[in-house]
């Protein structure tokens, strides 16, 4: 019952974990959430682990594919996506991949706030801010199994910091899909159709779709597709990390 109340609370799980972390800091000095040895210098990480985070340098300006810019990659040129651009400041590689895996598969909820803060720190001050955030939804069965949606919790932290509303009900996932790591590129494209559905009219203006990791971009394309059906919205995708190779990530 308590878990259900936390999931349905408007501030989400991250607000509760933040309170617990603040209380715990008075009892035990904070240490790095990754190596557990060195002191935390900010964002939950020690100086060594923070300096080791893989920055997404020179990415494709459209899909954020690492080490490809400054011109759009071949896929974005030949098959332009429905979103304007993906903003993913980190590459999905160690130690960033460890942080995200720990959050998703070990239920390390204390990592939500540090990951969101790292993304916020990397956001360009010149970036156009959206009118609302829409986290990538999970299907009901997957949400029950995991107990929380990382994209929802990350979006809530980002939204509170930027004073942007996070709309968790605008898009729903109506069909369960296999893990992307088990699919080829053609299979990912084939199953994309009809997976997500927008259940409310799309608001005009800029919308940011929020996810933890972008792999093949098929999820980003599918969510943007259903948001842009009326051609009155512009979509960007905000993610913590971008995989250099599509099979790098377990979903």
What are these regions (language model features)?
Residues 1-251:
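Glycine-rich phosphate/pyrophosphate-handling loop used in enzymes and phosphotransfer proteins
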């Amino acid at each position: 019952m308590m878990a259900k109340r936390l999931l349905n609370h408007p501030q989400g799980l991250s607000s509760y974990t933040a309170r617990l972390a603040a209380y715990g800091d008075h009892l035990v000095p904070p240490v790095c959430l990754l190596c557990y040895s060195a002191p935390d210098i900010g964002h939950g990480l020690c100086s060594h682990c923070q300096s080791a985070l893989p920055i997404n340098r020179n990415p494709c300006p459209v899909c954020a594919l690492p080490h490809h810019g400054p011109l759009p990659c071949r896929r974005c040129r030949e098959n332009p996506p429905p979103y304007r651009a993906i903003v993913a400041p980190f590459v999905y590689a160690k130690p960033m991949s460890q942080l995200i895996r720990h959050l998703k598969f070990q239920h390390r909820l204390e990592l939500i706030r540090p990951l969101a803060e790292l993304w916020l720190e990397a956001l360009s001050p010149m970036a156009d801010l959206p009118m609302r955030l829409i986290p990538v939804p999970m299907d009901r069965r997957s949400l029950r199994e995991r107990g929380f949606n990382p994209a929802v919790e990350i979006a809530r932290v980002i939204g509170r910091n930027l004073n942007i509303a996070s709309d968790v009900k605008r898009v729903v996932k109506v069909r369960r899909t296999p893990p992307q790591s088990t699919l080829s590129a053609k299979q990912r494209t084939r199953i994309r159709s009809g997976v997500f559905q927008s259940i409310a009219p799309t608001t005009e203006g800029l919308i940011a779709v929020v996810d933890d990791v972008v792999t093949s971009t098929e999820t980003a394309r599918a969510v943007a597709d259903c948001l842009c059906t009326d051609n009155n919205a512009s979509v960007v995708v905000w993610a913590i990390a971008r995989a250099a190779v599509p099979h790098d990530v377990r979903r």
